[in-house]
Regions:
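The feature marks the mature, well-folded catalytic cores of soluble enzymes
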Residues: 1-221
């Protein structure tokens, strides 16, 4: 569903300019900036279970990598087009691991992402918005509970509390896996009705400081 294939050069140039400007702003503030190593995303990828015509990209490391303490965890990812996205960050993770004896590089079990992981025709255009909103309110999402699935961008950390959004890209088995993995943290599953396509908690709310968050009004708390 949706667009795939190369973006236009104009949009790529604009996006790169935005990223470069943001990087330069951080560097001027004394912050070290590392950038991922892109691969050719405009190529067909496959596993023994499926094929995808193209891949996604590597603009948001927040989607793939979850940092908690001295550990960086590679998420399972729930889109087939993002299955190999972790490769863009491996050079940096290798560098961090070699330079810091306390750094832990972990990877969640890679899912097979067979057809059993998705509800057939869930994204059909024939389904109206009211039905979709009812589905999300009932926690009935496009992904099933076939195997643990989660994107790192579905997790927000508040001290020892990890708040995890249950939605399109993270299922309950994925949340349970996180609970077992982060035994020193409290993991809370949350759901935000009001968005028919709930993906990623960082598009739901963002903590600013103690006692203050910014909330997406379409995903009411």
């Amino acid at each position: 569903r949706g667009q795939f294939g190369p973006r236009t050069k104009d949009t790529v140039d604009k996006a790169n300019q935005l990223l470069d400007d943001f990087s330069n702003m951080l560097i001027k503030r004394g912050i070290k900036v590392d950038r991922p190593t892109p691969i050719d995303f405009n190529q067909k990828t496959s596993t023994p279970d499926w094929e995808a015509e193209t891949m996604f990209g590597c603009m948001p490391p927040r989607d793939v990598l979850l940092t908690v303490g001295n550990e960086i965890l590679e998420a399972t990812m729930s889109y087939r087009c993002r299955w190999f996205e972790y490769l863009c960050y491996r050079p940096l993770l290798k560098e961090y691991y070699n330079s810091d004896p306390n750094m832990r590089h972990e990877s969640a079990p890679k899912p097979r992402l067979t057809d059993a992981d998705y509800r057939k025709d869930y994204l059909s255009d024939k389904i109206g918005i009211e039905k979709r909103l009812k589905w999300t309110e009932d926690k009935f999402f496009v992904t099933t509970e076939e195997e643990p699935l989660f994107d790192a961008a579905d997790v927000l950390r508040f001290g020892k509390d990890l708040v995890v959004q249950h939605g399109f890209t993270t299922n309950l088995k994925g949340i349970d896996w996180l609970k077992r993995h982060y035994k020193d943290h409290r993991v809370h599953a949350v759901n935000f009705p009001g968005d028919p396509y709930p993906i990623h908690i960082d598009a739901t709310f963002t903590p600013i400081k103690e006692g203050l968050i910014i909330n997406n009004p379409q995903r009411r708390l």
